[in-house]
């Protein structure tokens, strides 16, 4: 496996120089952040980002993500224009030599948490999802904001989107996802760009909005929409592992042996209720996921693709984007590399 690290570009307080100093770090996961959702990413911007990362001694391993416009998810008549723009972006990424694109199909909101600075017993802070707190939230107030959300939505935009989604149930969302996949994956095949859909985070419906990339059955349904390695998965241990009904290691092995795991997000979560969890340190004993078994499974199907430590705690007084500090993710990367070395040497 190839260790990578999420970087938010020039506005990220964590420099490429610091990321390069993490032992075993090979690549960067990033995106173009100043192009509005639905517009084509210019080739020159992609090449400039790639060159900046290569000049720092690493490679641009994964684009995360090329966002999918809401009109596509809603199945509006305008979707064809946005799908063609998406395909043109993939062509530009392919021309620039980008090989993997992570994306999601979550309506309106990306990953969702109820608190960004929950204090753990050791004094560190972490992201937490408390079902009761989320149920009390009003997403239409315009006051909620999380690092993964599209900040361009106004209060009026959100109200309109929620009105639009009243007509979209899970099966309609599946239909709209299938329409998107049938148009996009042939272009990905032509450009040799592996697509890797990210599971919904958390993997259940929120705020009355449908979510469908949530469990083994639905991931199987997804890959069967278009039978190609280019129609693949981002296997995120924290997202899928947040639902105690999901056996993440079993899912990882199953889809890995099918050759459909194109990217891996590795993080741990501690389950504290049926639909409540804390994000923990990567160490197995700190959470509910056995990270040794995760890495052992990756080795078992000879995974050579990119992996990145996902959301970390804030430790040692660090401040910045919640979940995306340097220190805990660097510890996570080193821990994962250590596990992989041990598994590899033990299986020679």
Swiss-Prot record:
It comes from the Bacteria. Pathway: Carbohydrate metabolism; pentose and glucuronate interconversion. It is an enzyme of class 4 (lyase). One of its GO terms (biological process) is D-glucuronate catabolic process. Catalyzes the dehydration of D-mannonate. Its cofactor is Fe(2+); Mn(2+). Its EC number is 4.2.1.8. It comes from Staphylococcus haemolyticus (strain JCSC1435). The keyword Manganese applies. Belongs to the mannonate dehydratase family. Keywords: Iron, Lyase, Manganese. Transmembrane segments: none annotated. This is Mannonate dehydratase. One of its GO terms (molecular function) is ferrous iron binding. Pfam families: UxuA. It catalyses: D-mannonate = 2-dehydro-3-deoxy-D-gluconate + H2O.
